[in-house]
Amino acid sequence: YPDMTVFTTDYVIVKQGKLISGDAMLWIKRILRMPLRFPQMNDRAWLKKLAFVLGNPICCPATTYHKAALGEPFVRSEYSFALDWDNLVRLAEEPGRFICDERPLLYYRVHEDATTKACIRDNRRFEEEREMFCRFWPEPVADIIMGFYKKAYGEYE
């Protein structure tokens, strides 16, 4: 697709030497990415943004950007944790197609020194993700979603 601006794939988590490819979190992310699997429609802003209304289902290391089409700098965010989610939502509003290949083409290692764990400990992750949900939902709905979403933080323990 010559108008592709973002390409992403599924991934396998490597945690304490074990490969994880079918836990609940990964299945939820696959479901959230479904709108990006329709090539006849995945160039529409509303459909691209639909993939992000219940969280960021995209693993940044499993993502490639068409920098020439997006311009520089193509990453612009004030966030330190939710910057990928914030940036992808912004890019979804730009012309171009988001392509998702659900084959797991990346192994993603979760480890003790991961930035994600630090952001959970200092509450940065919660604050930034709540702000992102408030972009899509009224605050009471965002708080309900965060109640469920926060349970996924245990995946990093």
What do the PLM-derived regions correspond to, one by one?
Residues Y1-T5:
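Conserved donor-nucleotide/metal-binding helix-loop-beta segment in metal-dependent transferases, i.e.
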Residues C134:
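Juxtacatalytic substrate-recognition/specificity segment
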Residues V12-I13, D113, G154:
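Short, internal active-site loops enriched in acidic
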Residues F7-I20:
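Short beta-strand-to-loop element that shapes/binds the nucleotide-sugar donor at the catalytic cleft/hinge
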Residues I120-R130, M146-E157:
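Non-catalytic, C-terminal membrane-associated alpha-helical segments of glycosyltransferases
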Residues T9, G22, W27-F126:
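Conserved nucleotide-sugar donor-binding catalytic segment
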Residues W137-P138:
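TPR/TPR-like (Sel1-like) alpha-helical repeat modules
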